[in-house]
Amino acid sequence: MKPIQRARLQTRCSRGFTLACDDDATIRVTALLPDLARITLLRGGEVRQKRSWSVPARGEFDTPWAGRARLDDSSWPAVSLELTATEAELNLATEAMRLTVRLDPLRMNWALSDGTTFASDREIQPYFLGQKTHAFRHAMARRPGDRYYGAGDKTGPLDLYGRRLRCAMRDSLGYDPQRGDPLYKNWPLLIVRDGPSGVSHGIFYDNGPEGCFDLGCEHDNYFGRYRYYEAEDGDLDFYLFVGPRLQDVTPKFLALTGRTALPPRWSLGFAQTAMGLADAPDAQAQIRGVIEKAREHEIPLSAFHFGSGYTSIGPKRYVFTWNFRKFPEPKALMRDFAEAGVKVVANVKPCLLDDHPQYRDVAARGAFIAGAAAEAPLKSQFWDGEGAHLDFTNPAAIRWWQEGLTNELLGYGVDAGWNDNNEYGLWDDEATSAGFGEPTPLSLLRPVQALLMTRATREAQLAAKPRERPFTVTRAGGPGIQRYAQTWSGDNTTGWDSLKWNLRTGLGMSLSGLYNIGHDIGGFAGPTPDPELLIRWTQAGVLHPRFLMNS
């Protein structure tokens, strides 16, 4: 990568200004609200990803299916601001914030309206752009006493200071609850409590490709104390908003990316699942026994989550199919749950194995992620076989998904879908999404695929039952999934350390704007918990919106 060293004023507008920089780069500096500034770096006047699915137009709950035009700021209200310029620097001041841009060498500084600095770029070379790749880096100063929070589902202490954390999605079964990274979310939001001033702010990088936050792990003597966000692809396009209190930052992030979907009341009650139940040869009888045991022991069971075993033949899973040997009468079983007042949530996966009965039909629709030969599905390893992932930036895939969910699950009496295994771990550089008519590397859109899968599930449920508040769950995704779904900390492991550290992960997720969350009570992987561990985990689970015992 190469640093951007110098800038000059190119144009002014009612919201801010544009800088002309080295190597045909430009930087747009705009004030969207008195306490919200946006910085967008363009190469050759263009952005790499022309649309955003994380930031709706101002006042809208959601983006269009094909995303919002990234550079369109027209929905934001007019902001009263003052622009001043000298040969050495530019100043943009609102009633809440003052942004100063030093032009040579390039550096930005953010302060309150009274002049109190709360955030600054690194003194030397804060902006880097890849010359042979689409990578970039943004480095900011670390100050004594800084505290860092957020970044999604991160393990370990709540304060992330001193760590290097990846913004990426992985199927992290059995992760280390104190040190494991990454988990399931790509969440490039950092909440900073500035040490010297005590002022808190958030900085959100609206970028989907994989990246990382270095929050003081790296040290280079020539550059002083610094932290940075870097990504292997995409756009350096960030929103910086001042609290100024710590508790003010998360609501402002949600005002930007969309508020939490209001869940139905039943989803807040106790739920039960176990992977082994749906995998058992007599699965229907065993699952019916859950209803009977709950009644016998007076356990107020609100929901049962079906593991993917209802679709299994041997170790393989076939989405939107039923294994009628294990479930000879699935509709009758759903009626039993309904009569007991228990809702049913069924596991669904975005990949079709190549021997799935509908694989050829879906391939003929062009609804899979494509490989080097654009017309051919890209195959990858998935659940003891090879398969292809659905491309939710293709309307054909969305239609097929919603038809399958409606006919094969909702039509059988299932109440909701549980979007699982949606990290889109395809590591072929030539993997390509349809991009709603603009073919796009999958590397730019992994979190978007999980987000749109979840949206497709939610909207199919709403169409089937328009008078009921929809509910769905997703394991993976990026900022915006809170508009549709509940989520959780994934496939944890039985042990006191998981109970301890998952609580901190949950607090970090909540600070990141993921409010409807929880953890697998008792641990998903590992041995059976001892009685005290299970009791303590259940007591903690009562205090979470997702109150689910899973193994």
Regions found by a protein language model. Give the residues of each.
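N-terminal accessory segment at the very beginning of proteins
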Residues: 1-267, 271-275, 282-292, 306, ...
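Aromatic- and carboxylate-enriched substrate-binding clefts and catalytic-loop regions
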Residues: 61, 65-68, 302-551
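Generic secretory/membrane-interface signal
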Residues: 96, 153, 165, 229-231, ...
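Acidic (Asp/Glu)-rich catalytic clusters
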Residues: 258-261, 295-298, 506-511
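A generic structural motif
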Residues: 274-278, 521-523
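Short, acidic/polar
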Residues: 280-296, 398-407, 503
